[in-house]
Amino acid sequence: MHIVPAHQSVKFCWTVTNAFLRGAVEKTDNEELVMMNDVYEKFLKSSEEFIFAENKPEKSDIIFVPGNGYPQMAEKAAELFKKGMADWILPSGKYSVVNGKFSGVLEKSNVYDKEYGTEWEFLRDVLIKNGVPDQKILKEDQATFTYENAIYSRQVTDHAELEIERAILCCKSYHARRCLMYYQLLYPKTEFYVVPVNADGITRENWRKNEEGIDAVTGELSRIVKQFSLMLER
């Protein structure tokens, strides 16, 4: 028996239902279909609000930047740092556990053109080139997935004896909720401000318009349900 992965099932239902409801409502004035479409739109809106977490940042103790190959999150962190929004920045990441190595700079490789062995090396270079003093950049270069970003970042701040009462989290827009959940788990007493960045073309406004966006968002929903359910069972 072939088992369809959860995120593929969600994506399939989402795509088919979306196409069916939109097509049906265009062809008929049936009140039930109109009502179904309204319910579906509310569901999509709730999903967007959940996945695309965002806050207005306030003065914090630190800015966290989970590992990735895009420079935009670290650029945003540098911008916030230079505005006096935090005293420290902690980029985190070795490389993806899936790839087994740093897979390279995904955008602006003409600007960030060094040979990087880890995500942390790359993000550090982005921060420095955007005006952040090297001594204000903490180091975490062992994490290979999001939960480890949070775990090892906590170890770094504990070792540095930093009291983190408030923190800013700079991450990819559709990755925001899962990042927040993991970091909040490791910093239960910390107030977080999520500052998401659109790095790969998938945004809150356009994710429903193409398969790549639907894949990204439904994949996040699936991972949150699966990963946190397993964690709670333990």
Question: PLM features: residue spans?
Answer:
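Short hydrophobic alpha-helical segments enriched in small aliphatic residues
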Residues: 3, 8-10, 19
